[in-house]
Amino acid sequence: MSQVNMRDMLKAGVHFGHQTRYWNPKMGKYIFGARNKIHIINLEKTLPMFNEALTFVERLASGKNKILFVGTKRSAGKIVAEEAARCGSPYVDHRWLGGMLTNFKTIRQSIKRLRELEVQSEDGTFAKLTKKEALMRTRDLEKLDRSLGGIKDMGGLPDALFVIDVDHERIAITEANKLGIPVIGVVDTNSSPEGVDYIIPGNDDAIRAIQLYMGSMADAVIRGRNNVAGGTDVFVEEAPAAAAVEG
């Protein structure tokens, strides 16, 4: 099992939190101190929590379960899409649509429409339409693909969520909580860890940090799937209760 180490996290700037005036007291136990009015995250605490989350994801993937990667803010979207695609996992990189989990039946209908438009764009149907109608369908296709392209092959609800910036993706976390879907989340010093089953205290803004989180998670999914291919039986633990978060 491959583990993240302290050197990796320091190089990526995982330890740099937000300005001290924006801190969330519920993250106090993960803060080492402050430097130039910036909170410094205690990586001695982050390291085992990060590796525990990776172990959970690897075990889930070994059971052929689906992990949905969520990161819709500007600094995260591109990396989320690339790493999710690398490990063959579903993702949301543009905008979380309300009801994406709790109203998946309706979302499924939109995915069906997306697939229909994809077929029409490839089989020459668009070319037979009026210019205006073809343009409207092309715009519909682009809009649906931007919103749902990352989950069109998910097939059903995911078995876990991995979230970059839990405050930014609070709606996604709330929906997962309602459905009992475990949440793994990067939680910065200005955010609340509530509703997150596997907390990774760390910088949720720096590109290199996001690359480390996403790359490590994608690697964990790939390792888990390779375990299946190799016939390895792996026991999947239940996520610790979100209610256990102190504060």
Curated annotation (Swiss-Prot):
Gene3D superfamilies the record matches: Glucose-6-phosphate isomerase like protein, domain 1 (3.40.50.10490), Helix hairpin bin (1.10.287.610)
Organism whose genome encodes this protein: Pseudomonas savastanoi pv. phaseolicola (strain 1448A / Race 6)
Keywords annotated in UniProt: Ribonucleoprotein, Ribosomal protein
PROSITE patterns: RIBOSOMAL_S2_1, RIBOSOMAL_S2_2
Cellular component, GO, one term: cytosolic small ribosomal subunit
GO MF term list: structural constituent of ribosome
Family that this chain belongs to: Belongs to the universal ribosomal protein uS2 family.
Name of the protein in its database record: Small ribosomal subunit protein uS2
Matches recorded under CDD domains: RPS2
GO biological-process terms attached to the record: translation
Segments traversing the membrane: none
